């Protein structure tokens, strides 16, 4: 057993015990006997026999690191050893993944399913007391489930998913280690003058990934394309001049996601100075992640800090407080500061005040925040402030009553660079923050 597997093996029992206790509590509360969690199944494109890439149910991979096996099931009740119904068909068309020995296998009663259509033989006979958790409602209905994705139950689980176990922390460190290695390869490709497409290939090759292995579609943008927040076009043509490079790209380990962003300037110029300033601003925001602090308040503080950057670089003609009051900062920073991170890139539970799912509203002037929850120990966040020169938003500002608050000549000079986003992945501990991304060597 490798050192990493030994560490995971030592941490996994406590993780399973935590899930068992959580399941027992929510089943008692909702007067249910158990949960039947479906890994999912392949979905065919319309009028086609080809399937979309399979993406496992996050509630399934919460229990065990099986992320590419459709038609599998978990039956859990919080007390007995969970049952894993593992799909292993006899199939000469496709590769079948046998169930290998692992550190987690002993925690499950394992049953092999050879035909997906015969799963009912292995599921509880009387399903009245069981809730189906998964996306295939038609399958659940056909099998006779009455309780399908009950909202109170999901609220409870989603709220508690905000707190990560030590096992989950280690999985997130490993996904960050992969992403850091790939980011370094991508940076080198940019500096040698590659195209967006070739940079993407360098990223994937460095960690042995295919296109569908990343937890989300990589954003690999050069020059003005850096102003498009979710740019995914991957131009194969090399630009005549390399000016800027923004990469927002992650990796996956055991179903847990890394989500890292970096921005680079090709030259040591004013844009490079702006990147350095935004990098320090990002680290200041990381330092503000403390138990008991509202993430909304941290976003608002960072929002004002970006206003100060705009003033210091003479992009605006007013002080930061005036820029906050007038609302012009949102033109340059139009998204939220970050989000919870875990089994999903934008992990669940970010807007919940309690395990009942009580919603915590975001301020009307900050509609794109992805979390409004109070920060607590063992939570994991991204911190990703940005500063962009987006033509459509700048046009709206220029046509507004606040146009005279902007130094348009200086702003126009930056349009060719697109924008800046810098994003790290952080574990909040009781006495300190663990910046996984920086600790693993990505500056």
From Swiss-Prot:
Recorded E.C. number(s)?
Answer: 3.4.13.9
UniProt binding sites for Mn(2+) 1:
259, 339, 384, 423
Task: Say if the entry is tagged with keyword DNA damage.
Answer: no
Q: Which UniProt keywords apply?
A: Dipeptidase, Hydrolase, Manganese, Metal-binding, Metalloprotease, Protease
Catalytic activity field: Xaa-L-Pro dipeptide + H2O = an L-alpha-amino acid + L-proline
Binding-site residues, Mn(2+) 2? 248, 259, 423
TM ranges: none
**Species whose genome carries this gene:** Colwellia psychrerythraea (strain 34H / ATCC BAA-681)
Gene Ontology terms, cellular component aspect? Answer: cytosol
Q: How many cofactor units bind, and how?
A: Binds 2 manganese ions per subunit.
Gene3D superfamilies assigned to the protein according to its UniProt record, in alphabetical order: Creatinase/methionine aminopeptidase superfamily (3.90.230.10), Creatinase/prolidase N-terminal domain (3.40.350.10)
Describe the function of this protein: Splits dipeptides with a prolyl residue in the C-terminal position.
Question: What cofactor does its activity depend on?
Answer: Mn(2+)
- Pfam assignment, any one: PepQ_N
Per its record, how is this protein called by name? Answer: Xaa-Pro dipeptidase
């Amino acid at each position: 057993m490798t050192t990493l597997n030994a560490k995971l093996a030592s941490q996994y029992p406590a993780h399973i015990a935590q899930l068992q206790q959580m399941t027992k509590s929510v089943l008692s509360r909702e007067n249910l006997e158990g949960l039947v969690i479906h890994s999912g199944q392949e979905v065919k494109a319309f009028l086609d026999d080809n399937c979309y890439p399979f993406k496992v149910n996050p509630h399934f991979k919460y229990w065990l690191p099986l992320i590419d096996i459709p038609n599998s099931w978990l039956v859990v009740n919080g007390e007995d050893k969970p049952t894993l119904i593992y799909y292993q068909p006899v199939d000469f068309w496709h590769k079948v993944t046998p169930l290998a020995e692992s550190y987690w296998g002993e925690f499950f009663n394992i049953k092999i399913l050879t035909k997906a259509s015969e799963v009912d033989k292995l599921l509880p006979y009387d399903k009245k007391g069981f809730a189906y958790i998964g996306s295939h409602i038609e399958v659940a209905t056909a099998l006779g489930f009455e309780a399908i994705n009950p909202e109170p139950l999901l609220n409870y689980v989603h709220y508690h998913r905000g707190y990560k176990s030590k096992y989950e922390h280690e999985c997130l460190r490993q996904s960050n280690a992969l992403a850091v290695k790939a980011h370094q390869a991508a940076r080198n490709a940019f500096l040698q003058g590659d195209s967006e497409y070739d940079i993407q290939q360098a990223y994937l090759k460095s960690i042995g990934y295919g296109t569908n292995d990343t937890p989300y579609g990589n954003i690999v943008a050069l020059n003005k394309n850096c102003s498009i927040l979710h740019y995914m076009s991957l131009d194969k043509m090399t630009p005549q001049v390399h000016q800027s490079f923004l990469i927002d790209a992650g990796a996956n380990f055991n179903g847990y996601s890394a989500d890292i962003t970096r921005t680079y300037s090709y030259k040591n110029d004013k844009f490079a100075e702006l990147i350095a300033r935004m990098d320090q601003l990002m680290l200041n925001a990381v330092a503000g992640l403390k138990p008991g602090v509202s993430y909304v308040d941290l976003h608002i503080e960072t929002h004002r800090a970006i206003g100060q950057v705009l003033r210091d670089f003479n992009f605006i003609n007013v002080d930061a407080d005036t820029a906050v009051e007038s609302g012009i900062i949102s033109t340059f920073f139009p998204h939220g500061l970050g989000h919870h991170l875990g089994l999903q890139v934008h992990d669940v539970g970010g807007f919940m005040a309690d395990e009942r799912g009580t919603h915590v509203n975001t301020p009307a002037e900050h509609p794109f925040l992805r979390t409004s929850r109070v920060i607590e120990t063992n939570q994991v966040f991204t911190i990703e402030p940005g500063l962009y020169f987006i033509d459509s938003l700048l046009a709206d500002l220029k046509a507004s009553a606040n146009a005279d608050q902007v130094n348009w000549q200086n702003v126009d000079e930056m349009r060719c660079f697109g924008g800046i986003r810098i994003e790290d992945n952080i574990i909040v501990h009781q006495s300190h923050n663990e910046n996984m991304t920086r600790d693993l060597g990505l500056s």
